[in-house]
Amino acid sequence: MDQQETLNLTISSVMRKDNEKVVHVRFERDQEGKKHFAEGIVPECSFEKIYGFTEEEVAQLKFYLKEHVQDIFKEAQKINDKEFWLK
């Protein structure tokens, strides 16, 4: 990824999946008129849907998630479920 490139990260509130607390994340960027995205889950730091990112870029995103799991959960705890889904 280019250092000058704008990459947006959107996070959900804390949710439950298989009786475990999780946060859904989405990285997005616009490149050449197309919306690239990678949707994943923390704390697994895995991605469910990816479009437009290379394998190397996805590896960088996974590394970012692993390094920031606690920060992501702290921010997600501030989000009200209704507020998230109404955006």
Summary of predicted features, one role per range:
Residues 1-13:
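Negatively charged, low-complexity tracts enriched in Asp/Glu with abundant Ser/Thr
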Residues 2-5, 34-38, 86-87:
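Structured catalytic/translocation cores of nucleotide/phosphate-coupled proteins
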Residues 7, 21-23, 59, 68:
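A generic structural signal for short beta-strands and their flanking turns/coil linkers
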Residues 7-9, 32, 69-72:
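Short, surface-exposed, charge-dense and proline/glycine-enriched linear segments
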Residues 13-54:
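A short, structured beta-strand/loop element
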